[in-house]
Amino acid sequence: MYARPPEPVWKLFSMYAMSGKNETFHGTTILLVQKDGRVVLAGDGQVTFGDTVIKQRARKIRRVYNDKVLVGFAGATADAFSLVARLESKLEQFQGNLNRAAVELAQEWRTDRALRHLEAYLLATDGKNVYMISGTGDVIEPDDGLLAVGSGGVYALAAARALVRNSKLPARKIAEEALKIAGEICIFTNNEIIVDEL
């Protein structure tokens, strides 16, 4: 008897579709740390489809608007890419004013019928301002310079707060350590960490 070869990825997706499950690509952790004049955005690399790990080293952090703005995203992948593109368009429209671009995107997201159903969160920074933009039309600016989204977001946020309060670590090291802790707890988060900073 011969072993059956592994199913190609496209067949795996079609099997999920035929099973009647409404599976989406999801699961990630994105963390933003603002400390001592630096802003760091970190994210893990895992992409899951239902309960299957599809990719280990996905890049969920992007530089947009001539590399002047960092954006991290969590949620449905296609939705997140669409929202990042719309945010970049708003940044172009408002000459790089992240505050105005974030508010306009959130308003559009909340009121536009097509956008309203997108399932994603964005973290964005221009090095001074930091925002979380949600699908409910919220633009949130943190009190403590820390933001996190995704399935492991609460773990990463708790770890980052503890490290900020009880250590002298720089922002980059805090982000890396907090993501590692989230990866130890959240099954949808791995330790293939991508970090970028402004």
Model-based region annotation:
Residues F49-G50, Y131-I133, I140-P142, A156-A158, ...:
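Short, well-ordered, mixed-charge alpha-helical segments that flank or form enzyme active sites
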Residues H117-S151:
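Long, charge-patterned amphipathic alpha-helical coiled-coil/hairpin "stalk" segments used as oligomerization
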Residues G45-V47, T77, K128, G137, ...:
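Acidic, glycine-rich active-site loops and adjacent beta-strand->loop/helix elements
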Residues E108-W109, D144, N166-L198:
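C-terminal binding/interaction regions
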Residues T28-Q34, V39-L41, A120-T125, Y131-M132, ...:
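Short beta-strand scaffold segments in enzyme catalytic cores
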